[in-house]
């Protein structure tokens, strides 16, 4: 069984990411990393808080938060800088 799983947070509803995270922990994964860029950052934060406070209270803790910036190709081939976040959740 894998000890770490990465979930990329994007355009789907927040509940999809919450369910994926809870299922990973129920399958025996010890650490889940939520990664998001741009507008999805707030969705990743909401996912982490919902898992910690509502779905697995007392069992999961937010271990680390990394704030990053990624360079991506924008329209017209120009390079843009986009904010990114990595939230590490671990079983307590």
Curated annotation (Swiss-Prot):
Acetylated. Acetylation at Lys-11 decreases DNA-binding affinity. The keyword DNA-binding applies. The keyword Cell wall biogenesis/degradation does not apply. One of its GO terms (biological process) is chromosome condensation. Pfam families: Alba. Gene3D superfamilies: Alba-like domain (3.30.110.20). It comes from the Archaea. The modification N6-acetyllysine is found at residue 11. Coiled coil: none annotated. Keywords: Acetylation, Chromosome, Cytoplasm, DNA condensation, DNA-binding. It is found in: Cytoplasm; Chromosome. One of its GO terms (molecular function) is double-stranded DNA binding. GO terms for cellular component: chromosome; cytoplasm. Its main location: cytoplasm. Binds double-stranded DNA tightly but without sequence specificity. Involved in DNA compaction. Belongs to the histone-like Alba family. HAMAP family: AlbA (MF_01122). This is DNA/RNA-binding protein Alba.
